Amino acid sequence: MKQYLDLGLKLKKVHRALEFNQSPWLKPYIDLNTRLRRNATCKFDEDQAKLMNNSYFGKTCENVRKYKDVIICTDKESIQKLMKKEKCDGWTTYNGNLAAVLLNRNVVKLDKPRYVGTAILGISKEIMYDFHYNYMMKEYANVKLLFTDTDSFCYHITTENDLYKDIKGNAWYDFSNYLEVHNNFDESKHLIPGYFKDEFAGQPILEFVGLRPKMYSIQPLEGAKKATAKGVDRKVRNEDLSHQDYKQSLFGEQQFTHNMVRIAQEKHKLYTVEMEKKSLSPFSDKKYITRNGDDFTTYSYGHYRISNQ
């Protein structure tokens, strides 16, 4: 809240407040996994240490009220007996002699520290907002945010200086993935949480095309594009969709469809499904879109600038 107020948020009313004590009791565990990750000798050990940190967030956010018990039955009498219970929440019959009955639990043990997940999200947002508002927007007057994800930003930066000289040695960045011959290479922050890494390792980006949330394509100076399209098979995204297709969809207001094949299962029986699915679309009902030549700007509905368009 203090950060939001410093950034200009107007607080009109406080409905209720919580008082609590804070301490970095989780820090030794996070630091341990960070050291294990940095000292890992193979990709598996590195990913395992990373998972131990990331999965902690998910485990603290679990809703234990949704836990169920599954009973496997092989005779009709047992199935009927369980189905008559008040805590029965459903059942699935696999064949004439096998069924699974879903039961709600009699006792729910509220043993998950839900506040931990809330605190992790809050601290993460504080770091992200601090970087965007207090560094990027102050350092580059004409910076434009292209998209953001949970822990990443994509910017269009206009500057008269050499951008790589600007950011060299900056406390916000981790340059450990740069080539060793690059002037900015520095592995002192390698795999340490809390720093921003250049996803293209010092390679300039030629073009960015954003269609909708989680549907964009980035074309670097060299190498293959990085593209996302939510709900689209990886094979279609990497092999069938080109960066030019994203541009054609945006400027030509054209929708693309592709045939996709996936493996599905029902009652533990596997089968393949072929479907024709929309892969690219420039239409979005979640944002107000303005256009100035080849430049598009989106605003959330209710934004004060919309009335001036």
Stretches found by the model and what they are:
Residues 1-309:
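Conserved acidic
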